[in-house]
Regions:
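Single conserved hydrophobic/aromatic residue that forms the stacking wall/gate
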Residues: 1-6, 11
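Non-catalytic C-terminal accessory modules of carbohydrate-active enzymes
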Residues: 16-166
Length: 166
């Protein structure tokens, strides 16, 4: 099954592909467009496409949301709208040493940040008052004393994760 780059499926199922398309400046990527003078999201990845009538095409337009969703892992829970319950599924690419993202919810600021050195990732998340979160430990990582998910009440939480595979 195919998905649009930056879409929910690509972010969740192929985070490394989404990351590469976001940071590279070779074909195909957002950086490719910028490197070649584009200031908007084109209809096609190819710059010489015969039919490219849209110079502001939403199909590839999830780059902004991708940062807080894809790397920060900040998602609402569909069963508790408005970020009363937050689903956290951060992604830690080995080639990136730090990241920080925030989202202003109706309950307050949600912040997800991390630093990475070698196999160690220090993850910090801030959950606003009257909210709670479920952190899904990413595949290939371990958290001492936890498996699968960690339930987090409102407040600031610092979690040390260790990469168990490259």
């Amino acid at each position: 099954q195919r998905s649009l780059v930056g879409s929910e499926m690509c972010i969740r199922d192929s985070p490394e592909t989404a990351y590469r398309v976001a940071v590279q400046d070779s074909y195909p990527s957002w950086g490719w467009w910028v490197r070649n003078g584009s200031t908007t999201l084109l209809e096609n990845w190819r710059l010489d496409a015969e039919r490219d009538i849209s110079d502001n095409h939403m199909m590839f337009g999830e780059i902004g949301a991708w940062f807080y969703k894809g790397l920060g892992g900040i998602y609402p829970d569909e069963c508790e709208p408005g970020f009363r319950h937050i689903r956290l599924t951060p992604y830690f690419p080995a080639s990136l040493s730090s990241f920080s993202a925030s989202h202003t919810s109706p309950y307050g600021q949600i912040m997800s940040s991390w630093t990475s050195k070698g196999r160690l990732v220090n993850y910090t998340v801030s959950i606003p008052a009257n909210s709670r979160a479920t952190l899904t430990i990413p595949d290939g990582f371990i958290v001492k004393g936890h498996e699968g998910t960690i339930e987090l009440p409102s407040g600031v939480h610092r979690i040390e994760m260790r990469r168990i595979k490259n």
